[in-house]
From Swiss-Prot:
Cofactor: Zn(2+)
Function: Endonuclease IV plays a role in DNA repair. It cleaves phosphodiester bonds at apurinic or apyrimidinic (AP) sites, generating a 3'-hydroxyl group and a 5'-terminal sugar phosphate.
This protein's UniProt keywords: DNA damage, DNA repair, Endonuclease, Hydrolase, Metal-binding, Nuclease, Zinc
Organism listed in the record: Cenarchaeum symbiosum (strain A)
InterPro entries: AP_endonuc_2, AP_endonuc_F2_Zn_BS, Xyl_isomerase-like_sf, Xyl_isomerase-like_TIM-brl
DNA damage is among the record's keywords: yes
GO biological process terms held by the UniProt record: base-excision repair
This protein's encoding gene: nfo
Reaction it catalyzes: Endonucleolytic cleavage to 5'-phosphooligonucleotide end-products
Residues binding Zn(2+) 1, per UniProt: H68, H108, E143
Protein name, UniProt field: Probable endonuclease 4
Superkingdom of this protein's organism: Archaea
NCBIfam families on file: nfo
Length: 280
């Protein structure tokens, strides 16, 4: 079972492996650089080598690791300047994943900025097709959104439609965020609701395309369109829904990453333990 959390790269990208080991991770996610800026410091061969050496020594399988895109890029942007910067960042992140030997890059689909879903998706597909030109084995993952205004990729049918336009198909997959799905309106809070939602995901996106699960509970209600993560099993989704998601991932060998708060209620270690217990 591959379970872990998002860990910091503060002090050097190899430190992320140390942070993952300290938390008992068998999977983990990182930002490869400062997520709040456009500029990225290059990863040297020595830095990449140290990261890969530590990862090998840690016994964490590379298949359980992923990089998350920075916050600023908007791949669905209809503003030419912003879109170009976003595409350049996407290409750069695919290259950085390749240097580190990390197989998955998690991407946000972005906002069409009021230009309409059709225009936004057109820009999004163009961005992904550009990134597919990078010659390495990195799989680019599309993460479902919580349904905020002007966002794309919240509804499973739309997510599946976008995915179906991308080639080569083997270069693309999906990262399902349980909090985002719940916030959009998929009621994961009961066993029956979770089954119905995952059946719909399978029909419209395909469980075979699910490569990483963001196992996050929700602070807000179902259909709220609010992206507010909460501790595993303690939020609005609750234990039944989190158990259904965790067991699905465990059964299919899909890495689970928690992106939950660290506060007086629980820390990363506590949420990883909760996820592991629910997965059985």
């Amino acid at each position: 079972m591959q379970v872990g959390c998002h860990v910091s790269i503060s002090g050097g990208i190899d430190r992320s492996v140390d942070n993952a080991v300290e938390r008992g991770c068998t999977a983990f996610q990182i930002f490869s650089r400062n997520p709040r800026g456009w500029r990225a410091k290059e990863i040297s061969k020595d830095e990449a080598g140290t990261f890969k050496k530590k990862l090998k020594e840690s016994k964490i399988e590379p298949s359980g690791t992923c990089v998350h895109m920075p916050y600023l890029p908007n791949l669905a942007s209809t503003n030419d300047e912003s879109h170009k910067k976003s595409v350049d960042t996407l290409i750069g992140e695919v290259e950085r994943c390749g240097l580190l030997g990390i197989p998955f890059l998690v991407t946000h689909l972005g906002s069409h900025l009021g230009a309409g879903e059709e225009k936004g998706i057109e820009r999004l597909v163009k961005a992904y097709k550009s990134a597919a030109g990078v010659k390495n084995g990195v799989t680019i993952l599309l993460e479902n959104t919580a349904g905020q205004k002007n966002s794309v990729g919240s509804e499973f049918g739309q997510l599946g439609s976008i995915l179906s336009q991308l080639r080569p198909a083997k270069r693309f997959g999906v990262c399902l965020d349980t909090c985002h799905a719940f916030a959009y309106g998929y009621d994961l809070s009961t066993r029956a609701g979770a089954k119905k939602s995952f059946d719909e995901f399978d029909k419209k996106v395909g469980l075979d395309n699910l490569r990483v699960l963001h196992l996050n509970d929700a602070k807000a209600g179902c259909g709220s369109k609010l992206d507010r993560h909460y501790h595993v099993g303690l939020g609005s989704i609750g234990k039944e829904g989190m158990r259904a998601a965790a067991r699905l991932a465990s059964k299919r060998g899909i890495p689970m990453v928690v992106e939950t708060p660290v506060d007086e209620t629980r820390d990363d270690v506590g949420n990883i333990k909760a996820a592991r217990a629910l997965a059985g």
